[in-house]
Amino acid sequence: MPYVPMTEYETASEEVRREYDDQIDKHGRITNMKRTLLHNVPSFKAYMEWYTLYDELQPVLGDRALSILSYAVSSGNDCLICGSFFKKILEDGGDDPDDLTMNETEALLHTLGTCVSLDPHNIPDYVYDGLKERFSDEVIVTIVAFCGLMVATNLFNTVMKVDLDEVLYNHKLLTKEERRNG
């Protein structure tokens, strides 16, 4: 059960309705997370900066690599909503998220995302070296900031117990325990 209910368009302020309309115009729908965040528009806008960083990284990394990175962070954090969201994107693209075929850069980003979520104090040197070989300092900072916003999104959804969006039901991420127990 969610910690707080989602906002409802019908009872929302004009400012919140504008954000709803903008999300529907851009994405065709509004997610449960965004509806929950819209209890506070500045909080909503802060989390939406994830899209700003995505748009900066997309020409450099591509959509698939960003989805792999986001999936690694989110599944490592056991975030039901975000893990399921990126699982769906990968599956819709023809991938098996549990058996990804990746190029070297995608594998590096997957490792980075996993390390960020599981043990950020001990990211191996080879990950940093691989990033330095491939990207400028500016891009590396953007990648790590993107991971940070992904972690923040994972945390928000988990702490607030936001309900899984219906469109994700068929792509539900198994918990770490469910994955361990097969």
Predicted regions and their residues:
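Hydrophobic alpha-helical segments
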Residues: 1-182
